[in-house]
Amino acid sequence: MQEQYRPDLIEAEVQQYWAENKTFKAIKDTNKPKYYCLSMFPYPSGRLHMGHVRNYTIGDVVSRYQRMNGKNVLQPMGWDAFGLPAEGAAIKNKTAPAKWTYENIDYMKNQLKILGFGFDWDREVTTCKPDYYKWEQWFFTELYKKGLVYKKTSTVNWCPNDETVLANEQVHEGCCWRCDTPVEQKEIPQWFIKITDYAEQLLGGLDHLPLWPDQVKTMQRNWIGRSEGVEITFQLANSEDNLTVYTTRPDTFFGVSYVAVAAAHPLAEKAAENNPELAQFIQECKNTKVAEAELATMEKKGMATGVYAIHPLTGEKVPVWVANFVLMHYGTGAVMAVPGHDERDAEFARKYGLPLLNVIKPINGEPLLEHELPYCEHGILFNSGEFNGLDFDAAFNAIADKLEALGKGKRQVNYRLRDWGVSRQRYWGAPIPMLTLENGEVVPAPLQDLPIELPEDVVMDGVKSPIKADPEWAKTTYNGQPALKETDTFDTFMESSWYYARYTSPKFAEAMLDADEANYWLPVDQYIGGIEHATMHLLYFRFFHKLLRDAGFVTSDEPADKLLCQGMVLADAFYYTSPTNERIWVSPTEVTLERDEKGRILKAFDKEGRELVHSGMTKMSKSKNNGIDPQEMVEKYGADTVRLFMMFASPAEMTLEWQESGVEGAKRFLGRLWNLVFEYNKHPAETTVEPTALSSAQKALRRDVHKTIAKVSDDIGRRQTFNTAIAAIMELMNKLTKAPLVEVQDRAIMAEALSAVVRMLYPITPHICFQLWKDLGNTEAIDFAPWVEADAAAMVDDEKLVVVQVNGKVRAKVTVPAEMSEDDIKQVALADSNVAKHLEGLNIVKTIYVPGKLFSFVAK
């Protein structure tokens, strides 16, 4: 064993051993309980960032721990390889997206290997390869045959100059990123999958995911947005036409003072035919793309249509307005407005001089005055005809019943969730497998024609997708007849919605999945990824699993039993202001710091000596140039040190502040562990621990060892508080470094302790532990060594600390043998000088004993 800890010598050697022995290869074994641990796969952007390192370190710790606990562990890795950034990089670097992507994959794969992650690389999937997306295309055609796929027009960002569709990321302040032309909203046909058919299952399934974070489940519930309401039909005045609205508050129905419709509503478009001003307003609304999240805060705008709707219960006319806050794709594209009892409706009504009608009063109060409106809580109806005096529930049902009896309404469950639009007018994605025949009929491509391959050797001009620009690519045949391929590609969330399942049989060529393998490994036991995916990927992931279940591939209802959402990695960010008033961000690796005695940053300077502004700890990002390159850190400190810091510096689900001083501390700790094993090996143990031969000091040290084992096992296995597990090991190490190695049993206890510490640290710092395990005389590799178990007998305390009180105040703490009787403890307490002093001149009237903890005297 070498004297110094040299990660640069150890780590590459251990990684080579793992690669040559295929240590982490997962093979189905029905004799062992399986454990599938999965971290969200990366987009191959070029380099790993610290967020990746944190995610994959957590997954690797869990995987190695479970393997030591006798599980058959699957921990795969792959690449979410399609996506818009590749197109931008290809244009910038004058290359093809495929070439750029594959080069990045090679580079990042090597980065993952030098961090020592125990992935089964034989199961690697790359989503841009035809053998992967072939089955995605096939599955889409099967969903189409089941009626779960349809095509309809939908709004996109359109650059009229380039005549191309733009992704949201390519619209900068309302203009095209390339030519600065104002962007328009355009309706084009797009493909959708009916996720709304599964809304109730997706909602109900959340109740069966006890090991998912509540925050994620709440976000999904809100995203699905189930509501119970009434769909109400208004007859239009002087017309045969109707207008349907949806409301969750039928109790406020008598407070309707106007109806608002979306700019794209047929009624609005019809009303605009002879009203140029209204037509212009509608066009303005359509060209202003608004995210749902912005609706609450944006300025409310509207215009009267000149059309009136007849209130079905009062017969009164209410005006119909076009409003920019009504979305065509939610509900019916029309809302009944009740300004007296809705904030948004009130804001609009006050702006345009529309009445605020008050029809709900507080349950225990008087009707409110107009300036106190809107009153948005549930209450008691008044000014509501026959429904006066009813509370919310009674009014909901009574008004719904009345409308249903009149044929003017029906109870309805609505969802905020929209069907999943999967068409993208981009090149770098999987082609959508639909064909258009000469007669206009659209048909799914047959299996024998799949995959419809994306040409990889292309030139990107930054304007048009190469498969849209090349009319020859689209030409094909169907049953001998000419046909055209769809030139849109799939949303890249399609690939990431089923990759977890393909890992179970990545090379299976006969079908999308090998059902035997899928049902052995699935569901995923532990899934790890960022909470930013809560309402997109994690919802599609659950949806796809139900689709796979209904197609007969899997038997489980949910894709993952347990979810851990790791926190972001933060780092200090520094900048100076340029002469043009621009912030120039400087990498923390190029900054010299002055700190106070508590380590707080006082001043920061760049290499030119410029004083910098410290903007605090923020998420590592390219925009603030505060990312720390994992590879540089591994080269400087070793992979184990980086991994240890990542797991120790913060609870897994909280943000982690990157502090190089903390990384240095992690390296010193591993150095102390190495030194302790080196010193122990000079005089190793000649015998095993003999519990009956131990002194009280030896028993105490051994007790600490086994209590630490119990805590670490619980912290890693159940609680997943990895940082507290490491803290407990560090605390034990402090005791071990001070422990004597003189007696035979001293060395026996040290042997037992070091064997335990090395195994407990192995999931976190596997390279050093692999080597130390060998240095401690073990012939088998640590990778399949059993997890260390705490000895219950060793944890029993020989002594206990009893607090002594006199009249409720602590007067002493006495250490007594664990088995000492109450009477004997009383005598020890009475013998204490401070207790005796406070009992002097008093009569003991009562004693209270809480076994092993407290002895209390009540005296007068």
Curated annotation (Swiss-Prot):
It catalyses: tRNA(Leu) + L-leucine + ATP = L-leucyl-tRNA(Leu) + AMP + diphosphate. The gene is leuS. Disulfide bonds: none annotated. This is Leucine--tRNA ligase. Gene3D superfamilies: 2.20.28.290, 3.10.20.590, HUPs, Isoleucyl-tRNA Synthetase, Domain 1. Belongs to the class-I aminoacyl-tRNA synthetase family. A motif ('KMSKS' region) lies at residues 619-623. The keyword Ligase applies. Pfam families: Anticodon_1, tRNA-synt_1, tRNA-synt_1_2, tRNA-synt_1g. SUPFAM superfamilies: Anticodon-binding domain of a subclass of class I aminoacyl-tRNA synthetases, Nucleotidylyl transferase, ValRS/IleRS/LeuRS editing domain. One of its GO terms (biological process) is leucyl-tRNA aminoacylation. Its main location: cytoplasm. PROSITE patterns: AA_TRNA_LIGASE_I (PS00178). ATP binds at residue 622. Its EC number is 6.1.1.4. It is found in: Cytoplasm. It comes from Pasteurella multocida (strain Pm70).
